[in-house]
């Protein structure tokens, strides 16, 4: 066992209202950062940056305005500096996500587009100084798209291999926990090209449901089945048993946010309304929870936690430290490859991310025995092929 992977999504919009920058990441406790999201041009398959100001232009206080040459700034430079300080930290460019996924249908729809996707994504990796690609296609809708996905992964793996030289570039995907979606994937054909799968084991319940429910439970509830429309063990068993995926290639994704249900008596009961949320309706950052007046609850039978306020009658479904403990134990007993979180800006505990301060990331790290039990394989820091002078030179003046 090479050690557990701790995989955190960093979103390029976190630098705005959330005021969360790469410098704020608990870099010591993460083995991988998935930098989200790059987009895909549906006409051509070209992969491109979705917010160049956040990604490569924003000048941080330590950035000079007087550098000569063609230089990179923004989140990409800050991640590059983190990689030099924390050599276990691999940064992957995450392509797609919920909002951009409709572009995959045509963007990966022809052999020409898939070739261009692989070539342009790989060029971004070598230009930006990243360690690989994470593809978040939510979700292939039929067998033709599933076949296109396999071919897309093959082409990406070949392009990364051709470009990596002495480095080791990684290729990962984010995959669904719902049977309607995972049953369409050609897992046995995908696995040879992939370093690991990030299982999106959250969003099981939300505003689209008629009843309040658990959004990230491990097991189904036998006593209150409407409270668990989905469950994680069923998905994990499918990937391993039906799909033939090695257990250590499955990374269990967990939410660092809660989904709210208003005017309800609790899990499995009707509700009306979802409330304001922190940044979007009905969704609260974990660090804003529990809400004032609410008490945290745990159901060990289903591996789920939530908060409830009897006076406001609001339920929020989210992972507490106690639920994170149960999931860390499950990851270890099922011999999974590690943990993934969506997304890093919402955790408690700041940069140190300690379990004692409520950090979900820190809880997992502590539960598996500390950073020495994490994946220590080194990142790449040499990019002679980058178009950016300061990155190519290793950010000498920083």
UniProtKB/Swiss-Prot annotation:
Glycosylation-annotated residues: 66, 103
Residue numbers annotated as active site: 138 (proton donor)
Subcellular location: Secreted
Disruption phenotype: Impairs autolysis.
Reaction(s) catalysed by this chain's protein: Random endo-hydrolysis of N-acetyl-beta-D-glucosaminide (1->4)-beta-linkages in chitin and chitodextrins
EC number(s) on file: 3.2.1.14
Protein's name according to its UniProt entry: Endochitinase B
Organism listed in the record: Emericella nidulans (strain FGSC A4 / ATCC 38163 / CBS 112.46 / NRRL 194 / M139) (Aspergillus nidulans)
Name of the encoding gene: chiB
């Amino acid at each position: 066992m090479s050690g557990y992977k701790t995989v955190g999504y960093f979103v390029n919009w976190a630098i705005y209202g959330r005021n969360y920058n790469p410098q704020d990441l608990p870099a010591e406790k993460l083995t991988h950062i998935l930098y989200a999201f790059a987009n895909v041009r549906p006409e051509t398959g070209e992969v491109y940056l979705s917010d160049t100001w956040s990604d490569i232009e924003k000048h941080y206080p330590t950035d000079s305005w007087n550098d000569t040459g063609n230089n990179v700034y923004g989140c990409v430079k800050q991640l590059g500096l983190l990689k030099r300080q924390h050599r276990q930290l691999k940064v992957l460019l995450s392509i797609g996500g919920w909002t951009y996924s409709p572009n995959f249908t045509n963007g990966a729809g022809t052999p020409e587009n898939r070739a261009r996707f692989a070539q342009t994504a790989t060029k971004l990796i070598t230009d930006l100084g990243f360690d690989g690609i994470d593809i978040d296609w939510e979700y292939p809708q039929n067998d033709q798209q599933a076949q296109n996905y396999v071919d897309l992964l093959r082409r990406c793996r070949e392009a990364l291999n051709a470009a990596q030289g002495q480095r080791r570039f990684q290729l990962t995907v984010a995959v669904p926990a719902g049977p309607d979606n995972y049953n369409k994937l050609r897992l046995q054909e995908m696995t040879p090209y992939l370093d690991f799968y990030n299982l999106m084991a959250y969003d099981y319940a939300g505003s689209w449901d008629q009843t309040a429910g658990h959004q990230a439970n491990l097991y189904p509830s036998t006593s209150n089945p409407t409270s668990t429309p989905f469950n994680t063990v069923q998905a994990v068993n499918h990937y391993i048993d039906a799909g033939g995926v090695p257990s250590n290639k499955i990374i269990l994704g967990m939410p660092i946010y809660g989904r709210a249900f208003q005017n309800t008596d609790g899990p499995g009961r009707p509700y009306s309304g979802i409330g304001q949320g922190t940044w979007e309706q009905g969704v609260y950052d974990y660090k804003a929870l529990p809400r004032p007046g609410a008490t945290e609850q745990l159901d060990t039978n289903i591996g789920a936690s939530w908060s409830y306020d009897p006076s406001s009658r609001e339920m929020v479904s989210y992972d507490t430290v106690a639920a994170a403990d149960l999931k860390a134990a499950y990851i270890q007993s099922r011999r999974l490859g590690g943990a993934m979180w969506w997304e890093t800006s919402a955790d408690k505990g700041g940069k140190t991310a300690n379990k004692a301060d409520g950090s979900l990331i820190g809880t997992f790290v502590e539960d598996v025995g500390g950073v020495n039990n994490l994946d220590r394989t080194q990142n790449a820091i040499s990019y002679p092929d980058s178009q950016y002078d300061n990155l190519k030179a290793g950010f000498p003046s920083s």
